[in-house]
Amino acid sequence: MAFAYSSFTLPNGMDSELEQFIQKHGTIILLAPKTVFCKIGEKIGGVYYIAEGRTSHYIIGQNGGEKLLYTLSKGWFFGEAVNFLNEPSTVISKADLPTTLYRLDHDTFLRLTDESPLFRNAVLMESAKKTLIMRHEIEILPLTPIGIA
């Protein structure tokens, strides 16, 4: 499958200009391993950028079981979809390793997306990659006929 040979699961590459830009506008958050920093139903009120470390993001099934949605490492954003839509989180997120995040509050995120092509393009690229990752996940699920007439 072509997905196995793609770079979809990798961030866009380390961009020192982007990192400096985010550091200038964000609030640093240092997390120990196994720290939960986002819960289902929580209004996160902003977007996180992973500067160092690794995070895992889980969904909960109807039977209460957890499923790993994705693992993100240095260079990824998290929370951009729920931030744009002003919706609560639909995942549980935790640090897997010592992790450094930068949090951009809701208003700052929207302003930077509007004003900075560098920032906007990075967010759009990563959102597109996450969409393709989810599409791949759907591809591997068994399909159940629904009886379309």
Annotate the PLM regions.
Residues 7, 99-100:
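Short active-site oxyanion
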Residues 114, 118-149:
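Polybasic "coupling" helices that flank or enter modular domains
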Residues 1-33, 77, 82-83, 115:
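Cyclic nucleotide-binding regulatory module and flanking cytosolic helices
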Residues 10, 35-97:
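Cyclic nucleotide-binding regulatory domains
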Residues 23, 42, 98, 139:
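Generic anion/oxyanion-binding catalytic loop in active/binding sites
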